[in-house]
Structures are given as C-alpha cells and as structure tokens.
C-alpha cells in the first residue's frame, strides 16, 4: 500500500494506541447537519443517533417473519462488500440485509482482486467508485482503513465499517445493544461484564463506547492482565482480574474469544489452562444475576472461553444476536443511504 494512502497499522507495543489514532479527530461520519452519512465508529456518535438506529431496527425485525422478506428502500442502489479479512457472520448478514433492502450486492473476491497484485487501497476504491457504487461495506486488518476510504471516496458514496484492525466493529456493537435492549429494556439499571481478550478485541471497544453512551452505570472488563488494555478505568470501566469476582450479580455477560491471529507473542498458557481460569461454566454463570443473559460475537471456541452447557443453555441469546444483526444492519444501511452533505 502506498504510504500516502496507508491506514494506521495495529501494534501490540501500546495498549492505548487507539487513543492516538489521527482518524479519531473530528467526526467524519456525520454530515454538516449532524446526520449519519458513514458508520465508522460508535465512539463520538450522539446518543440520539444510536437510539435512532435501534428504533429503526425494530421496524425491520418483522421483515424476517414475512413471506416476502424484502422492502424497496435501496432498490437501484449498488452495495459493494469489501472484506479484506475473512468473515462468515458479518459478511453474510450484511449481504442478507442489503438484499432484503432490494439493493444490488457485489462481493469483491479480494484474493483475485488487483489489491493482491499491488494496487493501493485507494486506487481500488476509485475504480469501484467509477463503477457507480453507492455503498462500501469494509472489513480491513488495518485500523483506520474505513476512515481513509470515507475521506477519499466520491461524495455520494457511503462507507460502513465492518471491522478495522483492533479499532472498532460498530455494527456488532449496535446489534449487541439491540439484543440487550430487547431482553433488559432499561440500560440505566444494568451491570454488564465483558470477559476475555479485550486487548485485541474491536468488539469490546465498540461495546464499551455504546454501553457508556446509552447510560449503563457499571461496565466491567474481566480478563488476564496480559489481555486487558490500559485506559479502561479512564473510560469508567471497572477492571477485574478474577472471573468469579467480576461476574457477581451482573445482568449481561459478553464473552470474547482469544484473538490468536492478533497476538504477537505467547501471552497465555494452553487453551485448557485458559478455560480453567476464564471459561464461562454453569457454576460461574450462577454467580451472575438470576436472569442474566449470555452473549458472544462469534466465532465461539467451546471449551476455551465458554462451556457448551452455557452456550446452548436457556440464558444464552447468542443465536438471537445473529438474527437481530440482520435488522440492525438493515437499519444502518437504510439510514446512511438517505443522508448526504
């Protein structure tokens, strides 16, 4: 990638590097009128916009139950899915969401694209824009890549961040908030625990920003010292290095997998040892509030961060997260498509 068009690279050298990313300055995802043109991060989004997305998703949930699962909101629009990292749930649910909005959906085969032959990211985007793309859904290993695209794409094009490095995964954060609201109704009375590899998790970052924006009074980060970033306390997050203590009386548990592909060294012992200390078992779940729900962004590693009895148990809402994710992504795409500078 040309240095003039290069997104910031992730580094394990600093747990608080995200606070120094230049692309966090200002709010390029909003129009001059404060409407959502791109969805790049939950950080900095007004509470009213977050709630508007969740309320709009309510309207799309019922589409799933219809005989004809389509609405004409994006008819005639072209949505390009640009996944520079592997994905199953996110790519598929974005494709389903766009199709149900009646858009024309194109999935770029990255391995066969010109980027694999040395073409810069922005040259790829400019060529796709020349094909009259209306929306880019982008997943990229480099933090800030969607910001770079949003800053340089044609004025009529909208960009949705489907996950960039360790920085953000805003639609996952939003669907997590939708799931919590569906089951718990009132954010202002909740204790929410995020457990596992928070250091490398873009989902954790998006969830923390969303939870604090929506007024959750107590957010807990639970994990080994080697997998927790610095700066959590400054964000109002309570940090626990003991799972049993951290789970006491919580209303929502969000489990995270180990992001082995983002680890630069041996930060942990074996998977079996990790499960003994940090795996969510029925016994540990019993420490939470009686009506606590269990969530996971996927993919799950059973026997590592979560026991199958919990993953498949009555308090698990993991599959419902996937279902709700379609409606939330429909809402995001529909909202941004209607807003222009």
Curated annotation (Swiss-Prot):
SUPFAM superfamilies membership: Aspartate/ornithine carbamoyltransferase (SSF53671)
Residues engaged in binding carbamoyl phosphate: 89-90, 139, 169, 172, 298-299
One GO BP: 'de novo' pyrimidine nucleobase biosynthetic process
Record pathway: Pyrimidine metabolism; UMP biosynthesis via de novo pathway; (S)-dihydroorotate from bicarbonate: step 2/3
Superkingdom classification of source: Bacteria
Coiled coil regions in record: none
Chain residues that bind L-aspartate: 117, 202, 257
Its EC number(s): 2.1.3.2
Catalysed reactions listed for this entry: carbamoyl phosphate + L-aspartate = N-carbamoyl-L-aspartate + phosphate + H(+)
Gene3D superfamilies referenced in this protein's UniProt entry, alphabetically: Aspartate/ornithine carbamoyltransferase (3.40.50.1370)
GO MF entries: amino acid binding; aspartate carbamoyltransferase activity
Pfam families per record: OTCace, OTCace_N
Transmembrane portions of the chain: none
Keywords: Pyrimidine biosynthesis, Transferase
PANTHER family membership: ASPARTATE CARBAMOYLTRANSFERASE, ORNITHINE CARBAMOYLTRANSFERASE, MITOCHONDRIAL
Subunit text: Heterododecamer (2C3:3R2) of six catalytic PyrB chains organized as two trimers (C3), and six regulatory PyrI chains organized as three dimers (R2).
Its biological purpose: Catalyzes the condensation of carbamoyl phosphate and aspartate to form carbamoyl aspartate and inorganic phosphate, the committed step in the de novo pyrimidine nucleotide biosynthesis pathway.
Protein name: Aspartate carbamoyltransferase catalytic subunit
Species the sequence originates in: Paraburkholderia xenovorans (strain LB400)
